[in-house]
Curated annotation (Swiss-Prot):
It holds the Pfam family DHQ_synthase. Catalyzes the conversion of 3-deoxy-D-arabino-heptulosonate 7-phosphate (DAHP) to dehydroquinate (DHQ). PANTHER family: 3-DEHYDROQUINATE SYNTHASE, 3-DEHYDROQUINATE SYNTHASE, CHLOROPLASTIC. Its main location: cytoplasm. GO terms for biological process: amino acid biosynthetic process; aromatic amino acid family biosynthetic process; chorismate biosynthetic process. This is 3-dehydroquinate synthase. Belongs to the sugar phosphate cyclases superfamily. Dehydroquinate synthase family. It catalyses: 7-phospho-2-dehydro-3-deoxy-D-arabino-heptonate = 3-dehydroquinate + phosphate. Keywords: Amino-acid biosynthesis, Aromatic amino acid biosynthesis, Cobalt, Cytoplasm, Lyase, Metal-binding, NAD, Nucleotide-binding, Zinc. Its cofactor is Co(2+); Zn(2+); NAD(+).
Length: 359
């Protein structure tokens, strides 16, 4: 069973997302024919899927691999340099090069960024192997590496030629990674009321990992993101900002833990709960709404407990570095109802007072 949808960004060429019930790498062959191919993956995914992927490629392809360490802390300048050095040392040229990101969000982000800057832009393909990367980071063209002062601070908007994935990847995906991915899925439920109702009615099948339901879940999640990206590919109008619901708080959590604590999806889950509580604090939603929204998050196995090892001063400093901020104004994605999110400016004092009473 295959589900296919198209992404039509504001400025970039359209491309397909292919969601497969089985794992068939032959779907990307048309995109690598007569190309120099660099497969970028990590140590974990390489052990599981690299041999199978290489076997699917035709014999006359010029193929190299670049295997990085596994973890958010390796979404770094050092890892980027390793990719670029591999390209240069093997004489990859602009018109014949295609990079293949075989892995989760970290691999997709750093490979996409390498593709964006190598010789001013070469082709790349996304093969996301985690639920989170399938529904979020592989779609929409955001590519980046982290800096010691903030997450995703060095990057570019750069779209892939195609996204191919399969729910068969879940067979080797740790449960913690699966639940972390569900946080991004649940985020889309707060953006779309129809999807909220669909998730609510299909919760048991999702938690049981029913194949047909999971394909539909991934497809619907990608459709929501694709619709937003079509309106505001490069965050010029503010429409795309709603995709960052939970991320202002979540990124600050990751930064405070030096990217070695909560996984990105886990931090987003906590971040959504924080954004919901902040919305209640500001009078945008009732106490009952806040409870219902947080209960919905938890019902998918997602923890919303704020890490106890983070001090408020450090957390506030991390939030001040958020990319959405401008002219010293703090910007948050807040919620007024299911399907009603908005980008709002708040003062530093308002945030400090909220943090004081919420700890």
């Amino acid at each position: 069973m295959i589900s296919k949808l198209s992404v039509s960004p504001t400025f970039s060429p359209s491309y397909n997302i292919i969601v497969d019930s089985v794992l068939d790498f032959s779907h990307i062959l048309e995109y690598v024919t007569n190309k120099q191919v660099l497969i970028v993956t990590n140590t974990t995914v390489a052990k599981l899927y690299l041999t199978k992927f290489l076997a699917a490629l035709v014999d006359d392809l010029d193929v190299n691999t670049c295997i990085l360490e596994d973890g958010e802390q390796y979404k770094s300048q050092q890892s980027l340099d390793k990719i670029l050095s591999t390209l240069l040392e093997n004489n990859f040229t602009r018109n014949s090069t295609v990079l293949v990101a075989l892995g989760g969000g970290v691999i997709g982000d750093i490979t996409g960024f390498a593709a964006a800057i190598y010789q001013r832009g070469v082709d790349f393909i996304q093969i996301p192997t985690t639920l989170l990367s399938q529904v979020d980071s592989s779609v929409g063209g955001k590519t980046a590496i982290n800096h010691q002062l903030g997450k995703n601070m060095i990057g570019a908007f750069y779209q892939p030629k195609v996204v191919y994935t399969s729910i068969e990847f879940y067979k080797t995906l740790p449960q913690r990674e699966y639940i972390a991915g569900m946080a991004e899925v649940v985020k889309y439920a707060f953006i779309s009321k129809d999807f909220y109702l669909w998730l609510d009615s299909n919760r048991d099948k999702i938690l049981a990992k029913d194949s047909v339901t999971l394909i539909e879940m991934v497809k619907r999640s990608c459709q929501i993101k694709a619709q937003v990206v079509a309106m505001d590919e490069k965050e010029l109008t503010g429409a795309r900002a709603i995709l960052n619901f939970g991320h202002t708080f979540g990124h600050a959590i990751e930064k405070c833990q030096n990217y070695r604590g909560l996984k990105h999806g886990e931090a987003v889950g906590v971040g959504m709960a924080q954004a919901i509580d902040f919305s209640h604090y500001l009078g945008l939603i009732s106490q009952q709404q806040a409870k219902d929204f947080k209960d919905f998050i938890v019902s998918f196995g997602i923890s919303i407990d704020f890490p106890k090892d983070i001090c408020q001063k450090e957390f506030l400093e991390a939030m001040l570095l958020d990319k959405k901020n401008s002219n010293k104004e703090l910007k948050f994605i807040l919620i007024e109802n299911i399907g009603s999110l908005s980008l709002q400016k708040q003062s530093k004092n308002e945030l400090e007072q909220f943090l004081d009473i919420s700890r």
